[in-house]
Swiss-Prot record:
One of its GO terms (cellular component) is nucleus. This is Transcription factor bHLH168. Belongs to the bHLH protein family. One of its GO terms (biological process) is regulation of transcription by RNA polymerase II. InterPro entries: bHLH_dom, HLH_DNA-bd_sf, MASH1/Ascl1a-like. It comes from Arabidopsis thaliana (Mouse-ear cress).
Length: 174
């Protein structure tokens, strides 16, 4: 009888040990997986597990949105489709020139799929027309390129002819 009890007790303790061992292995595996997740999400600092999971979820959502955006861009580029996201039915490039006294401001919006225009070419047009460039900026946002040039007439009495500058700029961008 005692022998049966020992075997019964032995098997019960053996099952308990196996359960404990499996639980320990599971915890070790989860700890390893969380450390991998932490290295991908925030490699600079250690976060508690709940914050780590929240940050990982938001990071995955951002990545999914980025993949969708890039797939859409790829589809448009491969399809040769040039889509205008701005309001109205105006086509890009969009050039606007404003002049006030001896100061002239040029704004140009182009699609990235269009022929590239070098900023120095635009600046040289202003300089050749007798203007001193005060500011020249180039920005790339999403699928658009924005050029802004602000110039001032070198000789205020002579001034600058905005129509001539606009004509020359249109020749460059077309």
């Amino acid at each position: 009888m005692e022998r049966a009890r020992e075997i019964g007790e032995g098997s019960a303790s053996s099952l308990r040990e196996q359960r404990n061992l499996r639980e320990k292995e599971r915890r070790m595996r989860m700890k390893h997986l969380f450390s991998i997740l932490s290295s991908h999400v925030s490699p600079t600092r250690r976060l508690p597990v709940p914050q780590l999971i929240d940050q990982a979820v938001s990071y995955m959502i951002q990545l999914k949105e980025k993949v969708n955006y890039l797939n859409e861009m790829k589809r448009r580029m491969l399809g040769g489709e040039v889509k205008n996201r701005s309001e109205g039915s105006s086509l890009l490039p969009k050039l606007s020139i404003r002049s006030l006294d001896s100061i002239i401001e040029m704004n140009l919006v182009m699609d990235l799929n269009m022929k590239g225009v070098m900023l120095h070419k635009l600046v040289s047009v202003f300089e050749e027309e007798g203007a001193q460039v005060m500011s020249a900026n180039l920005q790339n946002l999403n699928d658009r390129t924005f050029y802004t040039i602000i110039a001032q007439a070198i000789i205020c009495r002579i001034g600058i002819d905005p129509s001539r500058i606009e004509e020359r700029l249109r020749d460059i961008i077309s």
